Amino acid sequence: MSFASAPTVPTNTSHYADLPAASSALFQAKARRGLTFDQIAKAIGKDEVWLAAAFYGQARFTEDELITVGEVLGIGSSELVSQLGSHWWPNRGLGPMPPTDPVIYRLYESVLVYGHAIKAVIHEKFGDGIMSMIDCKINVERKEDPKGDRVLLTFDGKFLPYARW
């Protein structure tokens, strides 16, 4: 496994201050086991981006998923369930605005630069409405390119027309 792809624990944890302690335990166990989000996600039948969002407290595990994740990571699932079980709800929207992390800032910048253009094209193709982030799948792929590998992001969101009344 190359250094660039080795699972790690993020070094700056200030933006995790409002997350349950279980989130930190999940990241540490993932790094200790040397597993990727994709490997863990497959164990519970989820996508790697969804699983990463759940680690960051932005998506909600079921109790069965918490038990399986605990088994895969070798950590006590009873502690995970007690912190992230059916009584817990995500507080979505993590981090400062504007973002300070370079990767997250570039995603933010892409919406600042291309947001209105994307919106206009969505309206031309679908009509007056929005793309759901609730009913959405996100995929991250690596695309080889002679000028340097590229990041291919796919947002597969359900179109929701605005209601008329």
Curated annotation (Swiss-Prot):
The active site is at R106, E109, S132. GO terms for biological process: cyanate metabolic process. It comes from the Eukaryota. The keyword Electron transport does not apply. Pfam families: Cyanate_lyase (PF02560), CYNS_N (PF21291). Keywords: Lyase. It catalyses: cyanate + hydrogencarbonate + 3 H(+) = NH4(+) + 2 CO2. Its EC number is 4.2.1.104. One of its GO terms (molecular function) is cyanate hydratase activity. The keyword Aminoacyl-tRNA synthetase does not apply. Coiled coil: none annotated. Belongs to the cyanase family. Catalyzes the reaction of cyanate with bicarbonate to produce ammonia and carbon dioxide. This is Cyanate hydratase.
